[in-house]
A protein has these predicted regions:
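Accessory nucleic acid-recognition modules appended to NTPase machines
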Residues: 1-123
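Structural beta-sheet core signal
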Residues: 124, 154-155
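Short beta-strand/turn micro-motifs composed of small residues
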Residues: 108, 155-157
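Short, charged, amphipathic alpha-helix that recurs within catalytic cores of restriction-modification
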Residues: 130, 135-149, 153
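Nucleic-acid endonuclease domains
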Residues: 59, 113-114, 136-139, 147, ...
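Active-site ExK catalytic segment of metal-dependent nucleases
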Residues: 120-133
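Short active-site-adjacent structural elements
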Residues: 114-115, 133-136, 161-165
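Domain-level recognition of nuclease-like catalytic cores that cleave nucleotide substrates
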Residues: 160-187
Length: 187
């Protein structure tokens, strides 16, 4: 599935092929722009970070087709993953079009704290498909803030109310994209 950590060895065992074959196939998907690997950010000093990359398809439609999804229920897990994928692809497009030479990564600790996207050391972004955000949605961002590295901590959601609290911003997804393309979060 798109946006999931990819374990080359497990995938190779499931397919009964050598791990090098899986690595080559994933490389082929990247070369043909069908998908890309999002590396894990491992510079965390306070919490041990997972080092496994995530794989994203270039388009949520590919993910839906492979999953056999004809309609997307707003309350489904796939809807949330698709929304995350959409925001991730917008960030990736922004970095490419603006020729920003910043690392694009994600962070996950061994204790399960996670932040969906990191742009260099400037911006940490958590994506939630919910229409009403809560303090619980900031868990990963708050854990990452303890590192004192990133300048912006942003929760992107479908909640139309934009808020700011103690260096954290909760932004409606359209506002986030407007601000992203206006260069407000990155170099």
């Amino acid at each position: 599935a798109s946006g999931e950590m990819i374990n080359f060895t497990k995938l190779a065992n499931d397919c009964q092929v050598p791990p090098s074959t899986v690595t080559e196939y994933v490389g082929l998907l990247e070369d043909t722009l069908v998908g890309f690997l999002l590396p894990a950010w491992t510079e965390s000093r306070k919490r041990k970070a997972i080092r496994t990359a995530k794989f994203y398809f270039f388009d949520p439609g590919v993910t839906h087709m492979l999953a056999g999804t004809r309609t997307l229920d707003r309350n489904s897990h796939l809807y949330g993953k698709s929304f995350e994928q959409f925001i991730g692809m917008e960030i990736r497009a922004y970095l490419s079009y603006r020729r920003k030479k910043r690392e694009f990564a994600y962070w996950r600790s061994t204790h399960g704290y996670e932040v969906d996207f990191l742009i260099g050391i400037e911006t940490a972004i958590e994506v939630k498909a919910s229409q009403k955000v809560s303090g619980r949605d900031l868990r990963g961002l708050k854990a990452l803030k303890e590192e004192n590295i990133f300048k912006n901590y942003i929760l992107v959601s479908q909640d139309p109310i934009n808020t700011r609290d103690d260096n954290f911003q909760a932004l409606y997804w359209e506002k986030f994209l407007d601000d992203l393309w206006a260069d407000k979060f990155c170099c």
